[in-house]
A protein has these predicted regions:
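Structural signature of beta-strand start/N-cap positions in the alpha/beta core
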Residues: 1, 24-25, 45-46, 74-76, ...
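N-terminal beta1-alpha1 cap of cysteine-dependent amidohydrolase-like domains
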Residues: 1-71, 80, 175-186
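Generic structural signal for residues in well-ordered beta-strands
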Residues: 26-28, 93, 141
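Cysteine-nucleophile active-site neighborhood
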Residues: 44-116, 123
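Histidine-centered divalent metal-coordination motifs
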Residues: 79, 128, 166
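Catalytic beta-strand/loop cores that center a nucleophilic Ser/Cys/Thr
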Residues: 113-157
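A glycine-centered loop/beta-turn motif at secondary-structure junctions
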Residues: 146-186
Length: 186
């Protein structure tokens, strides 16, 4: 079972439906309706942290859930979820170089982990005004955009990935589906 922490975003159920199409059972809990203790007791096979408005520190229990589950549970953060991963591990979030809502960018990646087998420089949908300003040493930058923004991070030791773009967006499909499939195989 996948625990999906919903950060009150309209894209949450796009993620749910895509994960279910890939055969996953998904349980959705809002960020103010789940604690780190409850998330741990659920013993999910995977954790997905959804997009959402605002900053990671304003997203209910999101940071606590990431910190609690990340050592043992494959974790994927999308947009705000990606930013929350960066912040949970000691990085900093700041204003993006430019606001991008419903725009596409080319994503260059390292071809490893969730990016294995994906085409290089694929087009991805972006919907964000914040981005990773400082990535902590425990995270590797796994993808960047054509304008130099961090588009992906991967923990150097734990099964944790974040993507700033939206794999569930029609602007990223079908590559986004393949990325989620790679995540589920972790």
């Amino acid at each position: 079972m996948i625990l999906l922490v919903d950060n009150y975003d309209s894209f949450t159920y796009n993620l749910v439906h895509l994960l279910e199409e890939l055969g996953a059972e998904v349980v959705v809990r809002r960020n103010d309706d789940v604690s780190a203790d409850e998330a741990e007791e659920m013993a999910p096979s995977h954790l997905v942290v959804s997009p959402g408005p605002g900053r990671p520190e304003q997203s209910g229990a999101t940071l606590d859930v990431i910190r609690r589950l990340a050592p043992t549970t494959p974790t994927l953060g999308v947009c705000l979820g990606h930013q929350a991963i960066v912040e949970a591990f000691g990085g900093e979030i700041g204003p993006a170089a430019r606001l991008l809502h419903g725009k596409t960018s080319l994503v260059h990646h390292d071809g490893e982990g969730i990016f294995a087998g994906l085409p290089q420089d694929f087009s991805a949908g972006r919907y964000h005004s914040l981005s990773a300003a400082r990535v902590p040493a425990c995270l590797a930058v796994s993808a960047t955009s054509d304008d130099g923004e961090v588009m992906g991070v991967r923990h150097r030791e734990l099964p944790v990935d974040g993507v700033q773009f939206h794999p569930e967006s029609v602007l990223t499909l079908p590559v986004g589906r393949d990325l989620l499939e790679n995540f589920l195989e972790r």
